[in-house]
């Protein structure tokens, strides 16, 4: 079976109003953690690991029933201490004890270590959308913001489905305003390149 994260809201082409940096980062393949590492020191803070039910827009992508249990891992990826990305990953509960059991043992290591080191893992196309209040991802991203920063009207997010031995693991990544501010100010240069300047 081919798993696909696209639907009426999640599309392969970023929305027309997206900035150049947003279009680039929403469609950029490879490891997001590795791309962030070009900007500075990346740390992973795990905010949730639990059994849950999939969000409404996740069920179709994973071909699972509405109340089917899934294993959820949520993290915040920070660069030099500033939160840049809130990520939400899910796999069928049985798979989290089988094919994808390694995701339960990552702790503060990035999921990329698991996904990009295994030749058996394939990835669907990246899809993206604008996330506004009412979507559970909006709440997740809002909680990940640095203290004192106002919540934006919307967030840019992307997702894709990784497959191993016919079993899916979906990763959704929500870009936080600090990422766009950094790119606007410095481009892709590492933050420490500016220290002592």
Swiss-Prot record:
Pfam families linked? Chor_lyase
Q: Where in the cell is it found?
A: Cytoplasm
User: Which residues are recorded as binding substrate?
Assistant: 73, 111, 173
Catalytic reaction list: chorismate = 4-hydroxybenzoate + pyruvate
Keyword annotations from UniProtKB, A to Z: Cytoplasm, Lyase, Pyruvate, Ubiquinone biosynthesis
Instruction: Output the GO biological process annotations, alphabetical, semicolon-separated.
Output: pyruvate biosynthetic process; ubiquinone biosynthetic process
Renumbered to this chain, region (Disordered) spans: 1-25
List where Basic and acidic residues composition bias occurs: 1-14
Q: What is its main location?
A: cytoplasm
Q: Which GO terms describe its cellular component?
A: cytosol
Which Gene Ontology molecular-function terms are recorded? chorismate lyase activity
What EC identifiers does the entry list? 4.1.3.40
The reply on keyword Transferase is no
What's the domain of life for this entry?
A: Bacteria
Pathway membership, UniProt: Cofactor biosynthesis; ubiquinone biosynthesis
InterPro entries for the chain: Chorismate--pyruvate_lyase (IPR007440), Chorismate_lyase_/UTRA_dom_sf (IPR028978)
The answer on whether this UniProt entry bears the keyword Lyase reads yes
Task: Outline what the protein does.
Answer: Removes the pyruvyl group from chorismate, with concomitant aromatization of the ring, to provide 4-hydroxybenzoate (4HB) for the ubiquinone pathway.
Q: Member of which family?
A: Belongs to the UbiC family.
**Protein's UniProt name:** Probable chorismate pyruvate-lyase
Which species expresses this protein natively? Burkholderia thailandensis (strain ATCC 700388 / DSM 13276 / CCUG 48851 / CIP 106301 / E264)
> Which gene is the coding source of this polypeptide chain?
ubiC
């Amino acid at each position: 079976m081919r798993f696909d994260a696209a639907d009426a809201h999640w599309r392969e082409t970023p929305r027309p109003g997206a900035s150049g940096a947003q279009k680039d980062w929403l469609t950029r393949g490879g490891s997001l953690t590795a791309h962030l590492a070009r900007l500075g020191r990346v740390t992973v803070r795990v905010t949730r690991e639990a059994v849950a039910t999939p969000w409404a827009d996740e069920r179709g992508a994973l071909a699972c029933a509405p109340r089917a249990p899934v294993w959820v891992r949520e993290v915040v990826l920070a660069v030099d201490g500033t939160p840049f990305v809130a990520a939400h990953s899910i796999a069928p509960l049985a798979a989290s004890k089988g094919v994808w059991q390694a995701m339960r043992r990552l702790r503060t290591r990035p999921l990329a270590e698991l996904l990009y080191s295994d030749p058996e893992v394939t990835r669907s196309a990246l899809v993206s959308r604008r996330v506004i209040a009412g979507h559970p991802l909006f709440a997740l991203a809002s909680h990940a913001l640095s203290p004192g920063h106002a919540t934006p009207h919307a967030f840019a997010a992307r997702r894709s489905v990784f497959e191993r031995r016919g079993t899916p693991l979906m990763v959704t990544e929500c870009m936080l305003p600090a990422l766009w501010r950094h790119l606007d100010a410095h481009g892709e240069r590492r933050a420490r390149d500016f220290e002592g300047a």
